[in-house]
A protein has these predicted regions:
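Short, solvent-exposed loop/edge segments of extracellular or virion-exposed proteins
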Residues: 354-363, 449-461
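Internal "kinase-insert"/substrate-recognition segments embedded within catalytic cores
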Residues: 43-53, 58-60, 65-68, 82-86, ...
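Solvent-exposed beta-edge/loop recognition patches
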Residues: 420, 438-441, 456-474, 497-598
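Long, low-complexity serine/threonine/glycine- and acidic-rich segments characteristic of extracellular
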Residues: 365-367, 371-435
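Conserved NTP-binding catalytic cores of kinases and kinase-like/nucleotidyltransferase enzymes
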Residues: 1-72
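Short, hydrophobic/aromatic beta-strand segments
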Residues: 484-493
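Middle-to-C-terminal accessory/interaction subdomains
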Residues: 3-4, 19-25, 33-35, 39-40, ...
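Asparagine-centered strand-capping/turn motif at beta-strand->loop junctions
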Residues: 478-483
Length: 601
């Protein structure tokens, strides 16, 4: 057989459930050259007419007949959540040859545009690459000029590193571009590989800008739990393939999608969970990510990868796949999950959620550092009554520190350790008395007082100075509602409408106002000096002109440094909100700041 690697399609008809007939389809082989030359493994890729998609939704589907026990780890991926997983099922496939009626994994939608646009914001605009080996044939059917035979073959692999420059031709064959092929854009991938090759402080300073580290850790965790063989996630060297890397369009950071897990449950039940050199570099950044990785392992075990949960599903799948003997893997799952629990306990000592700092002290500061302990089952730390975690500094694998806001007089706090599923792991009290002259910002002393969301277009003079878009002249004003106390605005941040954090050390005097400009230079050019209030010397518009206010209205949310809601309201560009604020040169002034009522604007 010499033509097995052809991707030419042949016309076909598909009958689904002996009822629905799809005419005008086309089919090609699917698999590596090792699978395509093996009739028991070869799969199929089927394309449907644009006006008659499979189940009304899928332009193409694939049938994977190789190692169908992979359905178990795919089930774990879906059950665990927050791990990219495809729309897979099991199917009985009747091929043209009468002796080739077999089961297979039905891949209704792989990581294609259909999946991306439903799973990720602007997902179809990202760039996706399949990390693979190069397989080259070693023989022909008749000398040098003969046709190449798929077997035997040789294999060439490379690490996830820069291959000698920025020429995309160096990367094309090991990182197969899977979408937006016309753009042929390898820049995000090359940036990822450059960063992966850094070391020491350079690596630690750069990796979070290029990689969604926590997402990678969860993908690594599920594949190491599943004992996947022949896979990027589970080998220190030699398995430089079977992974998908996706460059997210919203922030340019890379995501890691599990891919081609045929060899599920291949590695021993007592094998380790940190075999990969790239994984070890990530968790070596610091205790934040080491504990996060072990926390992901624990969460996946408790959510899905345990014999109690998977047992009924193994019996269910075994009814359809009797030759796979899936029931026999219940013992593997039990042994594997117990072993990994022990590895987690050995890596990070188990402690109860608690505060170790002394409670009841006095302070003249507007914030106070508080320390405590937490095990890997704690995903974040919150103040009771809030829905966002505090900014936590992990001192070591199970010791944390947070800064709490302090106001004049007694301050009582309830700190909660929150698990991966949002459950409360533990809750502790802490108190401090404030006796300083500066209060931390909160809803009782700070408010949004004015918004200029749709300025007039730039004048010719402004355009000549580089201020080419009206959004550059947007601004938001905050007011200190206290007539006697200074407010500390450090790390107060907008989390909806715009994404912006006020720099540390920013203070606002009693009754004073501060303007946060979209662009500092543009603001000064158009509005000059402020007579009443101060101008923050930081812009919220980013260098690409994004992160701006909506001209048609949106929700604005302002949080304190402790993630307490200061302001949360929505404005519109139509009545009953004042329409003069919509490109009429006027701003939207809130007569009762923080009140989501257009009659008060």
């Amino acid at each position: 057989v010499t033509e097995v690697m052809s991707n030419d399609r042949l016309p076909c008809t598909v009958i689904h459930n002996d009822e629905i007939i799809y005419y005008g389809c086309s089919v090609r082989l699917k698999s590596s050259q090792r699978g395509r030359s093996n009739e028991s493994r070869v799969g199929f890729n089927i394309k449907f007419p644009s006006d008659n998609k499979f189940l009304g939704a899928h332009k193409t589907i694939a049938v994977d007949r190789s190692s169908q026990r992979e359905i178990m780890i795919k089930h774990v991926v879906t059950r665990s959540g927050k791990i990219p997983g495809m729309y897979d099922d099991l199917a009985w496939v009747i091929q043209p040859r009468s002796n080739r009626a077999t089961s297979g994994i039905l891949m209704k939608s792989r990581y294609d545009d259909e999946w991306l646009e439903n799973a990720i914001e602007d997902g179809e605009d990202g760039r996706m690459f399949e990390f693979e080996l190069i397989y080259h044939p070693n023989n022909t059917n008749g000398g040098r000029e003969g046709l190449k035979l798929p077997q035997p073959d040789g294999v060439v692999g490379v690490q996830m590193r820069n291959q000698g420059g920025d020429d995309k031709e160096l990367y094309r064959w090991h990182w197969l571009i899977k979408n937006n092929r016309d753009a042929d854009d390898y820049s995000g991938l090359i940036n990822l590989l450059n960063t992966m090759g850094l070391s020491g402080q350079d690596y630690r300073d750069s990796i979070e800008e290029v990689v969604d580290v926590d997402q990678w850790l969860r993908s690594f965790a599920v594949q190491n739990l599943g004992g996947i063989g022949d896979n990027y996630a589970t080998h220190g060297s030699g398995a430089w393939h079977n992974a998908i890397f996706y460059i997210r369009p919203t922030d340019g950071r890379a995501m890691y999608f599990p891919w081609d897990m045929d060899f599920t449950f291949t590695n021993g039940a007592t094998s380790g969970v940190t075999p990969s050199t790239d994984l070890n570099k990530l968790i070596g950044i610091g205790p934040k990510y080491e504990r996060a990785y072990y926390g992901h392992l624990l969460d996946i075990i408790e959510t899905a990868f345990n014999a109690e949960y998977m047992g009924p599903w193994l019996r269910h799948y075994s009814d359809f796949l009797p030759s796979e003997n899936l029931n026999g893997y219940s013992g593997y799952i039990r042994s594997r999950s117990n072993h990994v629990r022990n590895l987690i306990g050995n890596a990070v000592s188990k402690v109860s959620f608690r505060v170790t700092s002394k409670s009841g002290n006095d302070t003249d500061k507007s914030t106070i550092p508080v320390r405590g302990d937490a095990w890997v089952d704690v995903r974040e730390i919150r103040l009771a009554g809030t829905d966002k975690g505090l900014d936590v500094r992990w001192v070591d694998d199970n010791s944390w520190e947070v800064n709490l806001p302090v106001k004049s007089g007694p301050n009582e706090y309830t700190l909660q350790g929150i698990g991966f599923g949002g459950e409360i792991i533990g809750s502790v009290k802490y108190s401090v008395t404030g006796n300083g002259s500066i209060d931390s910002a909160g809803p009782e002393n700070l408010a949004i007082s004015e918004i200029h969301y749709h300025p007039n277009p730039p004048s010719d003079e402004e355009v000549s100075l580089g201020f080419t878009d009206s959004s550059m002249f947007e601004w938001i004003e905050l007011v200190n509602m206290s007539d006697s106390r200074t407010v500390d605005l450090s790390n107060v941040r907008f989390v909806n409408g715009i994404d912006f954090t006020i720099p540390s050390g920013t203070l606002l005097g009693p009754g004073k106002r501060i303007v946060i400009p979209a662009n500092v230079a543009a603001f000064k050019q158009r509005y000059g000096n402020l007579n009443n209030g101060s101008l923050l010397n930081h812009s919220f518009l980013d260098s690409d002109g994004n992160n701006k206010l909506s001209n048609s209205g949106e929700r604005i949310v302002l949080y304190s440094a402790a993630n307490i809601t200061i302001s949360d309201f929505s404005y519109e560009d139509d009545r009953p909100w004042p329409v003069s604020a919509d490109t009429g040169g006027y701003s939207l002034t809130l007569m009762m700041p923080g009140n989501n009522d257009p009659s008060e604007a």
